[in-house]
Amino acid sequence: MLYQIHTAPLARKAEIDLPASKSLSNRALILKALSGGRGSLSHLSDSDDTHVMQAAFDGDHTLVDIGAAGTSMRFLTAYYASTPGAEVTLTGSERMKQRPIAILVDALRSLGADIRYTEAEGFPPLHICGKQLRGGALTIDGSTSSQYISALLMIAPTLTDGLTLHLTGQITSRPYIDMTLSMMRRFGAQCAMEGPVITVSPRAYVPADLSVESDWSAASYWYELLALCHYGKVASGLQDGALNEAASVLQDKVFSKTSGSQDFALSEVTLLGLHPDSLQGDSRVSEYFAELGIATRFTDRGAVLSATDQPLPTEVCWNLAGQPDLAQTLIVTCCALDVRFRISGLHTLRIKETDRITALQTELRRLGFVVGAEGDDVMYWNGERCESQCPVVISTYHDHRMALAFAPMALCLHHDALYVDDPGVVSKSYPSYWDHLRQIGLSVSEAKL
């Protein structure tokens, strides 16, 4: 399926009922299961990832297919391995079978787990025979996926000897580890983190009632939309194939400001269910976009975003090691706003739903932006441009965040449509996204080329 997105007169103000956080939802489901299935969870995410997790706990299964849900693969691997009597084969999509899991499996085996690979060594599918694990001390590379670490932490109270986890090197996505520990405490766990050492005592979880807050990752696309409405450039297209070598000449001849146009009247967005004291690391999106002219204030209903008149920076330098899921949003936004950037902390992007570094470079080139990369950790843009494609068709690579981050670029194509391939991929985290874009006035419809 292909969607075409056209600019249209937009609402001046919008109120968006964001999806619940899938990061919090998935942790809550695991912790509820480890608590004996008791307690009440409300406002769970409606995402594919969370549905997969719920289905895994719905009855007895000998085969669990988690599709493209990486979080579910990591969390359920640890859960089943530590559940006496469980016997299950855990599999997923073809892409999932290419995503490494050896670090987690090796760690669980060192704790006594019975896990074997059924196809390629080091990758799903996995055959797991659950048993009581002994626990003890474990050392793991802190720069690995935080989901491995969170998976181990959540089962730690059920281990005979608890768990002392030593993290070596740079710790990746620390906010997600903090989120996991905080939620474990809500379910009665005794855990502490001092420097690179996390200690979890053996102690039975207790049931908890929990309402999941809205998703800050989903909020990032509304920051992007508002920034593009207020500051973005509207491209007339390079249909004649002529290339402007100087960025200033290109900006004058090819781009015009959107601000003030009736087609781009969106000036305030209220995002329901967001809190300033969030457990989610991606809540820092408000700080990043404050540098890009978008202010945030909080009411008892959520976050209210509004555009300011502050000048945009010529260049930004950010480290997203704690918020890698914001990379696509921020990189696409900076290109659209003509803000040069150097962004580090991206070393987990190549093993996400797709190789996000390569995917970003490829799709931004379709829009006329030449973005560089240094190894697996850094992406940068120095203002270099190339001939854009017409029409612009964005490939999503089975990655929800590619569709979510690139769709707002429709605001930057003047009267031309932006096309998004496989738009249904957004159901992985934000199923109502296209309806919400229509709600503010964008034209989103099926198309054929």
Residue ranges and their predicted role:
Residues 1-449:
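Short, structured segments at the rim of ligand-binding sites
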